């Protein structure tokens, strides 16, 4: 951090000194409001509760802050959202499996008063939450698959829906008053005699109230800064606070007039979206594109210096790290690291197909290298037209950051993927990564990633055991054959495909039920009002208000499964180094039986070191990874529709996500020993990276293997 100024050094240091806590305020104000509005339409109740939260949540402004507004009563503290789930709160307050403040990762601290208040508040929510109703509505077979680690939908059933990018361009141009005006025009034009018009009326009324809530919140911030200005003695800080107060009075109510206002407006919108519902991966889109006009005008008029603009960008980026989310421990194990997946994109091309890199792009990359923070996730869209000097600066930032940022995205490949899905050509250039690595059209798409996880290696384990879980002996979906009876690797693949398709179907059924429940109890008007064409259609995102939609949850273990099939083919069918019975016995004993010939450890060494592995540019392994990914990707795209199909958005398919976050570790615990030499409970491969320790021929060979993968299905990234 040697390149940042003193203010930024202090803000960054303060962030690292803060310990995350549990904040009861949002749960308190939200619950009280919902209790007061029983009997009214749910969308109006949630809008009123959103207003009440923003009207009452505590405000604070740090001594060095120049971008203001807070999610909870303290920085990095997490609100509680009891409308989604409550069971895990009770369990973990009692230490099952860990007390929140004693977790081995992502601890949250709390007072006894906070614990008592939350336990009292959740009494109202028992029987009303998305998660408990989903588990009650799921068929027994799906619940069993969930419990055994084949699929898992906790992340979008025990929480709100995220993975969105609102239309920041629109808000910065017209402000939320423009959103309200558009909503009122649609409301005034409704013919209430028409079927469905009443529901549209409720949505538009909720959209107006929700936007008014955010304006009111910003006005409260202005009043707070005005009061602080009267108390401080330092004249420079006094002027600063008065200017911040002026910013908050103007934005996001109206269009931004300066670069500082544009950043403040963007921050308040991002913050409000996280307070409306706690889905993560709410992202910033093409940050450099919508902020550059304000920067350019300020520089032209002499209202700002480049150094001041960099300070503002860095203060903004530090501020994003305050947004936090407490998850259940099982969910935390899949998103370890206080992971919020707030993505910020720069680069790419403009509507004319020219290089879109501008001075704000440079500021972001410099800030990324200077701050060395993990939020926001800075992403660079790399196009053949991208300026080489800018690419060199971004590569230097990667070296400085030392944590993998900025990330580099193939702009052309993602445009091809999106066009293959049916996205309009005029929108392709404007795509942006959302959340972890998913492709999204800002302001036009609903949820870039949504749906149950799929544990591909677990499905292979079931396939090799005739559909039976070897750890519990429970019989799930049965297909012909076992490891001891299959006669070829191709025969295994066909049975594997049948199993995969079955569990993909279970994913879709689960998400249809989840969507129906979210539609019933979790319609969110604010975020919907900032995505086209929700206002015109009078629908929330979950009801089909957006222009584009495609579901699909994270998939993990494709490469591990490919390695396992390649190993079976090599040692059983080609070289005949082992008999099926020998390999089966080694798996049964977790490669630990010393009394066989060869011994379990010797068999494991053979599998790890003498079989083809993905990541070595070896088609004997790579072809299986390609076949598995192609089957999953094409099946999602061609065989399934999400719940918004036929309601307005397109293409409403499912698509393949290979972004496991830390799910490769969590799902590994559900899988026994596998024929690739992996022991029980060990991690699966990460994304489309080779399995741990599998790459033998260096990084070029790894890239050659990865380059063979059928990326055309990877809308949700890899």
Where are the regions a protein language model picked out?
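Extended non-globular scaffold/tether segments
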Residues: 205-217
């Amino acid at each position: 951090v040697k390149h940042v100024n003193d203010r930024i050094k202090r803000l960054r240091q303060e962030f690292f000194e803060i310990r995350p806590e549990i904040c009861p305020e949002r749960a308190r104000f939200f619950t009280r409001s919902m209790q007061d509005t029983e009997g009214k339409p749910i969308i109006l109740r949630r809008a009123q509760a959103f207003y009440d939260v923003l009207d009452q949540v505590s405000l604070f402004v740090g001594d060095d802050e120049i971008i203001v507004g807070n999610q909870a009563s303290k920085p990095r503290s997490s609100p509680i959202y009891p409308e989604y789930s409550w069971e895990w709160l009770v369990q973990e307050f009692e230490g099952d499996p860990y007390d929140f403040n004693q977790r081995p990762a992502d601890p949250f601290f709390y007072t006894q008063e906070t614990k008592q208040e939350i336990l009292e508040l959740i009494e109202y929510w028992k029987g009303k939450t998305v998660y408990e109703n989903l588990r009650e509505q799921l068929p027994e077979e799906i619940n069993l698959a969930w419990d055994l680690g084949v699929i898992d939908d906790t992340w979008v059933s025990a929480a709100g829906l995220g993975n969105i990018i609102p239309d920041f361009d629109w808000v910065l141009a017209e402000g939320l008053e423009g959103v309200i005006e558009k909503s009122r025009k649609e409301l005034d034009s409704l013919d209430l005699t028409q079927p469905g018009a009443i529901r549209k009326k409720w949505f538009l009324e909720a959209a107006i109230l929700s936007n008014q809530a955010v304006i009111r919140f910003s006005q409260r911030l202005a009043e707070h800064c005005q009061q602080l200005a009267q108390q401080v003695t330092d004249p420079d800080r006094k002027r600063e606070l008065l200017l911040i107060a002026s910013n908050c009075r103007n934005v996001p109510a109206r269009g931004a007039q300066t670069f500082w206002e544009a950043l403040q407006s963007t921050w308040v919108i991002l913050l409000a979206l996280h307070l409306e519902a706690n889905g993560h991966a709410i992202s910033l889109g093409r940050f450099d594109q919508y902020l550059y006009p304000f920067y350019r005008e300020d520089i032209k008029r002499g209202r700002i210096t480049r150094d001041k603009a960099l300070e503002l960008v860095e203060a903004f980026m530090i501020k994003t790290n305050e947004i936090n989310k407490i998850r259940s421990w099982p969910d935390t194990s899949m998103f370890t690291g206080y992971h919020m997946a707030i993505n910020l994109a720069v680069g790419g091309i403009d509507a004319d197909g020219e290089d879109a890199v501008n001075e704000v792009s440079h500021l972001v990359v410099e800030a990324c290298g200077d701050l060395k923070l993990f939020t926001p996730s800075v992403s660079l869209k790399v196009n053949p037209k991208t300026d080489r000097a800018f690419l060199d600066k971004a590569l230097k930032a990667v070296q400085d950051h030392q944590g993998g940022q900025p990330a580099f995205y193939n702009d052309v490949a993602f445009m091809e993927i999106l066009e293959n899905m049916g996205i309009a050509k005029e929108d392709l250039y404007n795509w942006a990564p959302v959340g972890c690595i998913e492709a999204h059209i800002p302001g036009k798409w609903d949820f870039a990633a949504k749906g149950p996880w799929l544990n591909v290696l677990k499905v292979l384990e079931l396939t090799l055991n005739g559909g039976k879980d070897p750890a519990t002996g429970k019989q799930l979906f049965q297909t012909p054959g076992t490891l001891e009876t299959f006669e070829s690797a191709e025969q295994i693949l066909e049975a594997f495909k049948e199993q995969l398709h079955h569990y993909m179907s279970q994913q879709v059924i689960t998400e249809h039920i989840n969507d129906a429940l979210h539609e019933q109890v979790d319609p969110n008007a604010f975020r919907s009002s900032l995505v086209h064409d929700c206002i015109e259609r009078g629908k929330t995102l979950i009801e089909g208000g957006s222009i584009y939609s495609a579901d699909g949850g994270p998939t993990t273990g494709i490469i591990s499964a490919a390695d396992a099939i390649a190993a079976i083919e090599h040692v059983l069918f080609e070289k005949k180094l082992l008999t099926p019975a020998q390999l089966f016995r080694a798996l049964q004993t977790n490669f630990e039986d010393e009394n066989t010939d060869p011994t379990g450890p010797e068999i494991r060494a053979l599998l790890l070191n003498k079989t083809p592995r993905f990541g070595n540019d070896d088609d004997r392994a790579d072809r299986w990874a390609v076949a598995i990914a192609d089957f999953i990707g094409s099946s999602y795209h061609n065989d399934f529709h999400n719940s918004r199909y036929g309601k307005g958005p397109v293409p409403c398919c499912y698509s393949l996500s290979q972004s496991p976050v830390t799910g490769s570790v969590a799902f590994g615990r559900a899988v026994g020993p596998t024929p690739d030499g992996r022991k029980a409970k060990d991690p699966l491969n990460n994304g489309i990276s080779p399995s741990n320790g599998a790459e033998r021929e260096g990084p070029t060979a790894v890239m050659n293997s990865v380059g063979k993968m059928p990326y055309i299905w990877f809308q949700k990234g890899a």
